[in-house]
Amino acid sequence: MSDSEEDDVANLLDLSATDEYRVVTFYLKPEDKKENFSITQKNETKNLEKEISYYLAKEHILYNTNRVLYIYNEKEWTVEKDFRRVLKTLQKKIQDSLTRKNKKYELLIGVGKSVKGYHGLKDSFKDSKVALEYIDLIREVMGDRSKAIVDCAKLGFFQIFININDKEELRQYIPDSVIKLDEQDKKKNSELISTLECYLNNKQSIRKTSELMNIHTRTVSYRLSKIVDLTDIDFDNIPEILAVRNGIVILKILEQL
């Protein structure tokens, strides 16, 4: 879209060149991937647009093929938490309604970065789409399989890495220890990385790791011992553990590329 076309749209929607905006993308993810861009999905998305208008300003809601966009003006919400609360309420109620009607869709919401003026909206829209594209990976990394609202502004370093599409460049950020464990897993199907990740995500608790992975505590201890033997990892070294955690995330990003 050219600058003049953006100006026309901005005049139509009464958008400012100085206000702070975010693009919020609402997407109905079909249980069956073949249903993406289907007529059924498009019809459900049109219904979604109507539902959203009960919660958010109708004049800033746009239907876009198989998505609904909302242009969020930060000055219209004096407390950002109020907007987040509305999004959570909206998502839950609409999802509950879909479930009751046996509609095989999941309502996902991606929140783009804050931009100044309407000319930056395309960048915010791009960010909101990225949040949705990587929703499964984000859920896994954050340990929350039910997470349905993703804010790009809160992804931190994760967003930096998902913007790198060169696999070899990404590999440079993976510590040797993680690479060794990945190679071992591929050879022996040993589940060392998944065990290590679960262990680190649960305050290095063997018991909790055992419960979540549904394996015996002795199995967890054995795998951790194997991890130390292979990598000489120091679980008390905070910078090293941070690098390992980041490396595991990057490994998952690589699997998505």
Task: Kindly give the residue locations of the regions a language model identified.
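Cytosolic nucleotide-utilizing catalytic cores of signal-transduction proteins
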Residues: 1-257
